[in-house]
Amino acid sequence: MSDEAWKQTLICESINDKIGYWEYLAVTDKRRRSRNKAQSSGAENYKKVLEEQQRIYTAGGMGYGPEMYQVISNPMRNQKRVNNIEGSKIFAAMNSGAPRIALDIQYVEEMNKRDSGELGNQMQYTISENFSAKSPFVLDFVNSPSKEFLEQWLSKSVGYYTGNYINQTILPDFSTKGIKEFYGKSANTIYISSNARDVLDGPLTADVIGICVTMGRKREALSAARRANIRAYRLPIHRYVKWKSGPQYLPFPNIMNVLREVYMNGGDWSRALHNNISKRHLVNADDDEQKKMQMLRRRAREEERRELTEAIMSATKG
């Protein structure tokens, strides 16, 4: 492990946290090695294709490649034009009356590195899919943590804010203010929480929709809503979806897609939910051989983790 990884390990308070962090490092390293292998294989394949194209070109044929024939890309498409189009859609959304989305990040700094990194990646996809939408929402980050942590989080996990030409589009703003302070007490504001008693149904009429950026394990969203004195609602998943397998958790890009579709279709939650929930959650795991194998592998990993925890605790006693 690197020096930085050892430092993070020492920061972890419990053995379970340490093991979780090591698992995160192992998964990250495996992905990196797979990516490097794919890139190496791709480079070798490209070299072979280029050699074949060079042979065709030398023989007087239509060989494509450097210093040979070239395919001309669409001259009207460039990153600046794409950024300007995305920014213009966000600007139009500011004046359309659509709900503003308040992404509450007050808990992110307290999380372990694995969870904060995962949520950062989800925020990246959330911003990307919002840009791609025909009718995007205006996104804002509220209850922003310390500047030092925020800069590191954006750089390592979220992206966008550290890229080129970010001045050409409209990215979500950051504020240390709470939701009501940021949007004003007169705004019709609601908060999404899977632990809320009330159910959100019908057309979206709120001015502001608060969404807590957490993994949802400790009822943080409901606590945040109560502290801010904002009424909390849960999505009507139980009313319209027969969730058959896996944890009932929607990633943030999916939540945003559901809200956007409901706003556009006038309140058809059933269609919006079914369009944005992975089909694997709608199939009974007992009827799916692949699910059975995944379940067995997961149980094996859990048993290995339990044995490792016991071994570490035994070795560190006394």
Swiss-Prot record:
Protein name according to UniProt: Uncharacterized protein C56G2.3
GO terms classed as biological process: methylation; mitochondrial tRNA 5'-end processing; positive regulation of mitochondrial translation
Record-level GO cellular component terms: mitochondrion; nucleoplasm; nucleus
Alphabetized PANTHER family for the sequence: PROTEIN CBG09110 (PTHR13563:SF12), TRNA (GUANINE-9-) METHYLTRANSFERASE (PTHR13563)
GO molecular function: methyltransferase activity; tRNA binding
Segments forming domain SAM-dependent MTase TRM10-type: 86-284
Enzyme class: transferase
EC numbers: 2.1.1.-
Entry keywords, A to Z: Methyltransferase, S-adenosyl-L-methionine, Transferase
Family to which this protein belongs: Belongs to the class IV-like SAM-binding methyltransferase superfamily. TRM10 family.
